[in-house]
């Protein structure tokens, strides 16, 4: 279905018995995360918290809590996405089977981002960071965190949405030394597009403009975690997966996703860091406090009746397990084309997905060698370690 909002998706899930509403007041300090965790553990439905203590906004979680539910959300477009990836792997398929792939090519063209749409619901009102549900997931967390953010940045040398990056990098909203409502923490690791953008901005002594989107059509959230080739924009992918073009405007020089439920805009200043964390992470342990980039908040926008999406990470399996399964279904066949010599890969969920990847490769180039020693396999391993979300 072509959802135009997070709420449209949640109403569809509810209509099919895949969501329940929690009308009682729930505390964002540990209680919401605990409810989410217990429901996820038993394969339960998506959750809509209608009465969040200390906030006038509703919150939703466990949206992608099972692979079956994720497939249901994207039931009309998954096959099209898989065909698009097939075409990327083997463009000659469009020549050999033109009628089979004609619709896929047209869908990709129609999915290009749309600037300045007539409706801009996210600009309904300006709010403060402290108005957002301040969800504290684990007892030793350093503050409230955004766990389903879509963090947007642009290349200052090649500005524009088609050269932009959309990634899921955790955001700390409160705690530590952050000035309330004026500063937030931005945490990202190696091989992330935003790092390239910040490096270029730092070299020029310029601040990097960053926008953090939350909510909106569920395809936007998935696009932020997809390991996409550099030539495919996350926003175009979101348009294909969601069967609806990514809509955006520029406001005060910042990109704003008009279909998002919330948007935080701000600047990352060169060389300015603050302690971020601790945070109960994917491995079931706390990632400790370290210096990470500081984002100075410019504006915070919210649509009418906005819904704050969140998840809880920790010792696997968790909701991000379903993300990994969905991504593997869509992209698994692409890996052998991207990395020659690789036959199959498997990210081990029990290890937290990122730390352990199993790969089956081949030794093709030294059949004359009397003793088989890893050679091509080492090349493959280094290729994997340097490949975006596989690393």
Where do the language-model regions lie?
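Extended, highly charged
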Residues: 1-294, 298-391
